[in-house]
């Protein structure tokens, strides 16, 4: 009798334990991919994140390499042309600038052309960054050595997709940024400079 009572007590204990364990497992909050948050400097979506919106789930990445290789340079193109839709400076205008450049003069071998034809890790929706997008790359990734093990830049000017707004010079000049020093400068559209491609996620 005592042995049966002992077995019954063990059985009840096991049932109670399994029930409690099941309830505990059901209450665990398993995050989905949509809940994932990203950080600046993280490798993701074919490049390295340099900008995040307030949700920390969407932003911009820059290519991990100079387009075309370390020594390759490109002209802005469209020399002698005024492209008013390519004067966007702010974050988020790089793609619009790039599309405007290619619509006005679809020249092969230009910075914009090279960016939209770049592909990495299956991603092919790249564009030439705007002035402020380039400045953010400098500020968030290139200023110090914090992310040097993830991405590196040359001490050189990198072309933006932003044409000068100055009425006198807009047909011949575009903005570029030295990513190591962080300062912007204007240069002839025909001058060949290094480029990095950017994409949104």
Report the location of each language-model feature.
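Positively charged n-region of N-terminal signal peptides that target proteins for export
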Residues: 1-5
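General helical structural elements
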Residues: 6-8, 99, 200
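Extracellular adhesion/carbohydrate-recognition regions
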Residues: 25-120, 156, 172-176, 189-198
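C-terminal, surface-exposed recognition/capping segments
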Residues: 32, 108, 124, 131-201
